[in-house]
Amino acid sequence: MIPVAEFKQFTEQQPAFKVLKPWWDVLAEYLTVAMLMIGVFGCTLQVTQDKIICLPNHELQENLSEAPCQQLLPRGIPEQIGALQEVKGLKNNLDLQQYSFINQLCYETALHWYAKYFPYLVVIHTLIFMVCTSFWFKFPGTSSKIEHFISILGKCFDSPWTTRALSEVSGENQKGPAATERAAATIVAMAGTGPGKAGEGEKEKVLAEPEKVVTEPPVVTLLDKKEGEQAKALFEKVKKFRMHVEEGDILYTMYIRQTVLKVCKFLAILVYNLVYVEKISFLVACRVETSEVTGYASFCCNHTKAHLFSKLAFCYISFVCIYGLTCIYTLYWLFHRPLKEYSFRSVREETGMGDIPDVKNDFAFMLHLIDQYDSLYSKRFAVFLSEVSESRLKQLNLNHEWTPEKLRQKLQRNAAGRLELALCMLPGLPDTVFELSEVESLRLEAICDITFPPGLSQLVHLQELSLLHSPARLPFSLQVFLRDHLKVMRVKCEELREVPLWVFGLRGLEELHLEGLFPQELARAATLESLRELKQLKVLSLRSNAGKVPASVTDVAGHLQRLSLHNDGARLVALNSLKKLAALRELELVACGLERIPHAVFSLGALQELDLKDNHLRSIEEILSFQHCRKLVTLRLWHNQIAYVPEHVRKLRSLEQLYLSYNKLETLPSQLGLCSGLRLLDVSHNGLHSLPPEVGLLQNLQHLALSYNALEALPEELFFCRKLRTLLLGDNQLSQLSPHVGALRALSRLELKGNRLEALPEELGNCGGLKKAGLLVEDTLYQGLPAEVRDKMEEE
């Protein structure tokens, strides 16, 4: 006997593969099992029983025919037969060994090959059919994709997020009490599929209290943190799998090839079986030259299994015909429909997730096969193709991670004294942010695709909003809220055209800070959105690569008080529009590639502060024109290449702060002492070798920075500046400090590190405001002071 279990390995497949088997593949699988049983049964009979039985033919005939053998077939019994007729048999004088020899010889020579090998052919053909059907499940290039797809499909089908997403959409689409009840029933039914008895108990509880389900959010739709992370990982797997599978169509072509091969195999089997099935006969005439051994050369043989084999052959042909029809239908299905494209149109309409994309190639083909099994699989799988669904999940995970208590721990006071919440590099904006009604400043950095929800209106104290590389969409209903509450707006992006348009409609805005580049072809024009709606704007800061001052700046000329232009080294050419800013008090032109002080600045009669940091200024002869800016009190010319200060600096009598650090100055003009209103003078990081004695005329001077120069001595007149509080002399070449330093009674900070001092004058003890913390000097020099001086400085 041939055990059928030996053939089990040919049909064994993972149970999960059944989702990729349409009805015709399932039918074909059962047909192959039936055909295999026919073949195995025939082989068993062939092996275990006699194949053929032969008897010698006593009639001597030169040409052997089947006529004598046909006489042995059953015929009608004669009507009249003698009552006492003696039956005599023929003696053949053959022993058992001779009969066996003749049987085997006639089986090999006289019996047709089809009758001999029919059961073996059935088994071989059936095994080939089985291999063709399951080849794409075994071939490495296709099996890996199939296994990966089925693994992801099962996780998507069982994921709690799928249930939640579909139930939420169902709840949004349905209206009215009846619809609410149906949505609740759907949620309960979905929850009932979960593992364990807890789900059944919850289902019974909800069914028992239908009103409670309608009024309260069902617990079964909530995800814990672990389930949320699993769903998030599943979204990433689906994305990567889609990118990988949509690149080719190996699954589609492999399925077509194996189907075409099965059709060709079916036609070949059908043709030769119909031709040779009649060769299976009950009687077979056999002529072999064995007269010298047995005494006979002609035999009549009986093929013992011919009758059964003929019936099995017709049965097998019937099964093959049905199998072939399924293969032909499969080919029709493959070529009649666009299986390399799959549309989720019906799913989009049913679920309301309009962003579910259509797929192609192998991904589409597998989804078509899934629909033949159960279309619910593709519907639930589509949830993980939707970006809307993914954003909802991210939002849910964010809300789990960023609780209100955790957010309150991040609250800090910013430089403006506002209570600020800063969030950086998050996948989204947590809804819990809007539960912190005490927030006054919201800073969002590197957060992609922000859409402010209606909960933003709960931040009733919000005054400042910063969007740093965080593109944001604002519903129209919230624009009124921000227009009434927001005072400061900061936006930083790659290009200025990415600045949201709703920013320019915030009428209550007082400060607007924009940072981003103009496209290379638009940098010279420097076109910015109109600022006419910003009626309250007082401060405008723009960091870009503009070739000129944007024309829209003049829209706020009547009330703009501070303008800051940071050009990152790009040359700012056209500055004439600055003349229209009559109310401007502070102007910053930083890194604008300026080589001269712009003449347009001298027309700003209300100007109080001017900052020209990090430009290419070499000469400041135009400084005389600042006498027209009668309110100018602060002038910052630091980080330039200025080699000298002109003598007519004396005209700036109202100047209170002058910054000339990080230049190339070697001397200062004596006329600088005529700037009697000067309170702060910073000439650090230059090449000064000496100070003019006229510096002692600066009686209002409180801060003097001379660090990082080449000073060898200080004029005695310097110590006439009795109001001096800060004196920075670090990193010079001073060899001694005058005892007159004791006259600076208001001095509270003195820096002497990096000089050639050998000792400190004990008159430092007369500087009542100078403490140890304010004296920056080497420890050895400090220890050289008298003990009473040190004790006085260390007193709190």
UniProtKB/Swiss-Prot annotation:
<feature type="topological domain" description="Cytoplasmic">
    <location>
        <begin position="138"/>
        <end position="265"/>
    </location>
</feature>
<keyword id="KW-1003">Cell membrane</keyword>
<dbReference type="InterPro" id="IPR032675">
    <property type="entry name" value="LRR_dom_sf"/>
</dbReference>
<feature type="transmembrane region" description="Helical; Name=3">
    <location>
        <begin position="266"/>
        <end position="286"/>
    </location>
</feature>
<feature type="repeat" description="LRR 6">
    <location>
        <begin position="631"/>
        <end position="652"/>
    </location>
</feature>
<keyword id="KW-1133">Transmembrane helix</keyword>
<feature type="repeat" description="LRR 1">
    <location>
        <begin position="508"/>
        <end position="529"/>
    </location>
</feature>
<dbReference type="GO" id="GO:0098656">
    <property type="term" value="P:monoatomic anion transmembrane transport"/>
</dbReference>
<dbReference type="InterPro" id="IPR050216">
    <property type="entry name" value="LRR_domain-containing"/>
</dbReference>
<feature type="repeat" description="LRR 11">
    <location>
        <begin position="746"/>
        <end position="767"/>
    </location>
</feature>
<dbReference type="Pfam" id="PF12534">
    <property type="entry name" value="Pannexin_like"/>
</dbReference>
<keyword id="KW-0407">Ion channel</keyword>
<dbReference type="GO" id="GO:0006884">
    <property type="term" value="P:cell volume homeostasis"/>
</dbReference>
<keyword id="KW-0812">Transmembrane</keyword>
<feature type="glycosylation site" description="N-linked (GlcNAc...) asparagine">
    <location>
        <position position="63"/>
    </location>
</feature>
<protein>
    <recommendedName>
        <fullName>Volume-regulated anion channel subunit LRRC8E</fullName>
    </recommendedName>
</protein>
<dbReference type="InterPro" id="IPR021040">
    <property type="entry name" value="LRRC8_Pannexin-like"/>
</dbReference>
<comment type="function">
    <text>Non-essential component of the volume-regulated anion channel (VRAC, also named VSOAC channel), an anion channel required to maintain a constant cell volume in response to extracellular or intracellular osmotic changes. The VRAC channel conducts iodide better than chloride and can also conduct organic osmolytes like taurine. Mediates efflux of amino acids, such as aspartate, in response to osmotic stress. The VRAC channel also mediates transport of immunoreactive cyclic dinucleotide GMP-AMP (2'-3'-cGAMP), an immune messenger produced in response to DNA virus in the cytosol.</text>
</comment>
<dbReference type="GO" id="GO:0005789">
    <property type="term" value="C:endoplasmic reticulum membrane"/>
</dbReference>
<feature type="repeat" description="LRR 8">
    <location>
        <begin position="677"/>
        <end position="698"/>
    </location>
</feature>
<dbReference type="InterPro" id="IPR003591">
    <property type="entry name" value="Leu-rich_rpt_typical-subtyp"/>
</dbReference>
<feature type="repeat" description="LRR 2">
    <location>
        <begin position="536"/>
        <end position="557"/>
    </location>
</feature>
<dbReference type="GO" id="GO:0005765">
    <property type="term" value="C:lysosomal membrane"/>
</dbReference>
<dbReference type="GO" id="GO:0071470">
    <property type="term" value="P:cellular response to osmotic stress"/>
</dbReference>
<dbReference type="InterPro" id="IPR001611">
    <property type="entry name" value="Leu-rich_rpt"/>
</dbReference>
<keyword id="KW-1015">Disulfide bond</keyword>
<dbReference type="Pfam" id="PF00560">
    <property type="entry name" value="LRR_1"/>
</dbReference>
<dbReference type="GO" id="GO:0034702">
    <property type="term" value="C:monoatomic ion channel complex"/>
</dbReference>
<dbReference type="GO" id="GO:0005225">
    <property type="term" value="F:volume-sensitive anion channel activity"/>
</dbReference>
<feature type="disulfide bond">
    <location>
        <begin position="54"/>
        <end position="301"/>
    </location>
</feature>
<feature type="repeat" description="LRR 4">
    <location>
        <begin position="583"/>
        <end position="604"/>
    </location>
</feature>
<keyword id="KW-0406">Ion transport</keyword>
<keyword id="KW-0325">Glycoprotein</keyword>
<feature type="topological domain" description="Cytoplasmic">
    <location>
        <begin position="335"/>
        <end position="796"/>
    </location>
</feature>
<dbReference type="GO" id="GO:0015810">
    <property type="term" value="P:aspartate transmembrane transport"/>
</dbReference>
<keyword id="KW-0458">Lysosome</keyword>
<feature type="transmembrane region" description="Helical; Name=4">
    <location>
        <begin position="314"/>
        <end position="334"/>
    </location>
</feature>
<keyword id="KW-0256">Endoplasmic reticulum</keyword>
<feature type="topological domain" description="Extracellular">
    <location>
        <begin position="287"/>
        <end position="313"/>
    </location>
</feature>
<feature type="repeat" description="LRR 5">
    <location>
        <begin position="606"/>
        <end position="627"/>
    </location>
</feature>
<feature type="topological domain" description="Extracellular">
    <location>
        <begin position="44"/>
        <end position="116"/>
    </location>
</feature>
<keyword id="KW-0472">Membrane</keyword>
